[in-house]
Amino acid sequence: MVCIRRATVDDLLAMQACNLMCLPENYQMKYYLYHILSWPQLLYVAEDYNGRIVGYVLAKMEEESNECHGHITSLAVLRTHRKLGLATKLMTAAQAAMEQVYEAEYVSLHVRRSNRAAFNLYTETLGYKINDVEAKYYADGEDAYDMRKNLKGKQNHHHAHGHHHHHGGGCCSGDAKVVETAQAVDGKAVSK
């Protein structure tokens, strides 16, 4: 059995190892730390019954934008654990957090033109649409599809529930809650 849960600072090395095994796009540890300290609600891992991380999603909110939107930085599932719906569950968890915590209007991501499996997951299962093609986006010169999926965002959010409730923080409202959370996560890491 594999469970999907929010990532912690303690998961970052395993997430990086999973990334290195699965993808040609790799990141330094400080980039993972930047994500978890800035947007702790948006990182999820798939953990097997032995406590091993077998997949993850690394996501963030785009700050330099007039529209509040999330971005999927990286998604990976180990080859041994594919075809179990884990990528869909990881993506769904991150998208829901973007919507609930940050009131994101849409989610964006990039995918290699040649990556048919990922492209099919995004379009057929998760409802993403091609927004643009970015020529030579990847280091090896391959083009990327810039894809987007609309979320309810601010405009429909409260009406959909039929009642009003307050959400803490967000890229489009005050960031106080997010900073508090990041400091708490940071404090946890320092005090170990």
Swiss-Prot record:
Single biological process term from Gene Ontology: response to water deprivation
Catalytically driven reaction(s): N-terminal glycyl-[protein] + acetyl-CoA = N-terminal N(alpha)-acetylglycyl-[protein] + CoA + H(+); N-terminal L-alanyl-[protein] + acetyl-CoA = N-terminal N(alpha)-acetyl-L-alanyl-[protein] + CoA + H(+); N-terminal L-seryl-[protein] + acetyl-CoA = N-terminal N(alpha)-acetyl-L-seryl-[protein] + CoA + H(+); N-terminal L-valyl-[protein] + acetyl-CoA = N-terminal N(alpha)-acetyl-L-valyl-[protein] + CoA + H(+)
EC number: 2.3.1.255
Keyword Transcription (UniProt): no
Cellular component per GO, a single term: cytosol
Domain N-acetyltransferase: 2-152
Keywords annotated in UniProt: Acyltransferase, Transferase
Pfam family, one: Acetyltransf_1
Domain of life, source organism: Eukaryota
Inactivation phenotype: Embryo lethal when homozygous.
Tissues with expression: Expressed in leaves, roots, shoots and flowers.
Family annotation (InterPro entries): Acyl_CoA_acyltransferase, Ard1-like, GNAT_dom
Gene3D superfamilies the UniProt entry points to: 3.40.630.30
Induction of synthesis: Down-regulated upon abscisic acid treatment.
GO molecular function annotations of the record: mRNA binding; N-acetyltransferase activity; protein N-terminal-serine acetyltransferase activity; protein-N-terminal-alanine acetyltransferase activity
Claim: Thylakoid is one of the keywords in the record: no
Family: Belongs to the acetyltransferase family. ARD1 subfamily.
Role this protein plays: Catalytic subunit of the NatA N-alpha-acetyltransferase complex. Required for male gametocyte development, embryogenesis, suspensor development and the formation of the quiescent center (QC) in the root meristem. Involved in plant immunity through the regulation of SNC1 and RPM1 stability.
Quaternary structure annotation from Swiss-Prot or TrEMBL: Part of the NatA complex. Interacts with NAA15.
PANTHER family xrefs: N-TERMINAL ACETYLTRANSFERASE, N-TERMINAL AMINO-ACID N(ALPHA)-ACETYLTRANSFERASE NATA
Protein name as annotated: N-terminal acetyltransferase A complex catalytic subunit NAA10
The species this protein was found in: Arabidopsis thaliana (Mouse-ear cress)
Lineage of source species: Eukaryota, Viridiplantae, Streptophyta, Embryophyta, Tracheophyta
